[in-house]
């Protein structure tokens, strides 16, 4: 049985190291009991059933580095089934689009192409009886998200009638033939959690953990890549809780009422894992359930706009004549995309359950180094080093 358990754990660790990497690290279930001697103070093996034991024997501190690198979080859009905008254009005649209608939301349940999240932090743990840890991390995170333009509700107005774009005109075209990507700045991040070695039998340990993490970065760069409307914004600002039509100065540098695009990241996780100690090496395998959300309050960000029309252009978008042979003289703004905007919808986990494999290297029962890979619900790697005081 022992040989079988050793083989299973070593095989899992090897498979995780060469397979695809993936929420929050599960960690080694043996962590609370691996470092039994202190670097500064000598460790005390306290027995909770000993009437002479004191809290000084029961409590110890560990500290170290915590690095978590999510290369591809599997996310989807959390948006309603309908989206309010102008009616879909039909035929060849221009028109005014001033009445809102509920249309099928192209962002509903849309999957993102890529989502990355990187965290570097300091780690401190309060250990009780060499069995339970209560820990926190303080550090910094930054991220990257990429998806189809439909996932960000990229919309615009095309085929508008008249010699001006009225303030009550609504976008009438959903643009799904593009890609939108955003980069966040590096900002403060923190997490708290608990981990316990619940059952031990010889060199095997079964444990469980719980964690919560939070960060609130701002969008540093927004790139919209679409053949009819392409733009890039540094530190973009937009409108929160504002329905269409957007203000007439939307997209102008001096626009009023805009707010910074900020993403509120939350994540909960519970996990269980099994480890087996082989001298200084402690491989482990585990499962975790996590739920992550990235919420930007559905902020709407407008394409940069010229304060006044230049050569009948309100933005630097290409003309789309289609089968027409000349630009209309009566409908001056009908042949290129107007009042383009995108919306940063709420993202959430598409898959909740994942598998974790990893190993811890222990030195003199005072120092340890852990490497971990997470699979299925994300591709991520984790590395941490810690010592006991």
From Swiss-Prot:
Keywords: Cell outer membrane, Cell shape, Disulfide bond, Ion transport, Membrane, Porin, Signal, Transmembrane, Transmembrane beta strand, Transport
InterPro entries in the cross-refs: Major_OMP_Chlamydia
Molecular-function GO term, any one: porin activity
Domain of life of the source: Bacteria
GO CC terms: cell outer membrane; pore complex
Pfam family, one: Chlam_OMP
Major subcellular location class: membrane
Purpose: In elementary bodies (EBs, the infectious stage, which is able to survive outside the host cell) provides the structural integrity of the outer envelope through disulfide cross-links with the small cysteine-rich protein and the large cysteine-rich periplasmic protein. It has been described in publications as the Sarkosyl-insoluble COMC (Chlamydia outer membrane complex), and serves as the functional equivalent of peptidoglycan.
Protein name: Major outer membrane porin
Organism lineage string: Bacteria, Pseudomonadati, Chlamydiota, Chlamydiia, Chlamydiales
């Amino acid at each position: 049985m022992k040989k079988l358990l050793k083989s299973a754990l070593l095989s899992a660790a090897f498979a995780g190291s060469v397979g695809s990497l993936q929420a929050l690290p599960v960690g080694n279930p043996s962590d609370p009991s691996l470092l039994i001697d202190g670097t500064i103070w000598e460790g005390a093996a306290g027995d909770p059933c000993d009437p002479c034991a004191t809290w000084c024997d029961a409590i110890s501190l560990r500290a170290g580095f915590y690095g978590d690198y999510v290369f591809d979080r599997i996310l989807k859009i959390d948006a309603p089934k309908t989206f309010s905008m102008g009616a879909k254009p039909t035929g060849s005649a221009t028109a005014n689009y001033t009445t809102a209608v509920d249309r099928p939301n192209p962002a509903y349940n849309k999957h993102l192409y890529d989502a990355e999240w990187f965290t570097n932090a300091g780690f401190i743990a309060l250990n009780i009886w060499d069995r339970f840890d209560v820990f926190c991390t303080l550090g910094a995170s930054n991220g990257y998200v990429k998806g189809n333009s439909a996932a960000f509700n990229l919309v615009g107005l095309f085929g508008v009638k008249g010699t001006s774009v009225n303030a009550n005109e609504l976008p009438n075209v959903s643009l799904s033939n593009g890609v939108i990507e955003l980069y966040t700045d590096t900002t403060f991040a923190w997490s708290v959690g608990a981990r316990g070695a619940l059952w031990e039998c010889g060199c095997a340990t079964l444990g469980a953990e719980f964690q919560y993490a939070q960060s609130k970065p701002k969008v540093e760069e927004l790139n919209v890549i679409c053949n009819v409307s392409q733009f890039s914004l540094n530190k973009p600002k937009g409108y929160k809780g504002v329905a269409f039509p957007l203000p007439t100065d939307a997209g102008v540098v001096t626009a009023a009422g805009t707010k910074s695009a900020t993403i509120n990241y939350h994540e909960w996780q519970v996990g269980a894992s099994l480890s087996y100690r082989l001298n200084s090496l402690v491989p482990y395998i585990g499962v975790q359930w996590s739920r992550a959300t990235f919420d930007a309050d559905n902020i709407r960000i407008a394409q940069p706009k010229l304060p006044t029309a230049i050569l009948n252009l309100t933005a630097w978008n290409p003309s789309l004549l289609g089968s027409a042979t000349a630009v209309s003289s009566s409908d001056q703004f009908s042949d290129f995309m107007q009042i383009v905007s995108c919306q940063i919808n709420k993202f959430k986990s598409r898959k909740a359950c994942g598998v974790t494999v990893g190993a811890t290297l222990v030195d003199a029962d005072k120092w340890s180094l852990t490497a971990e890979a997470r699979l299925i619900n994300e591709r991520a790697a984790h590395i941490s080093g810690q010592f006991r005081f």
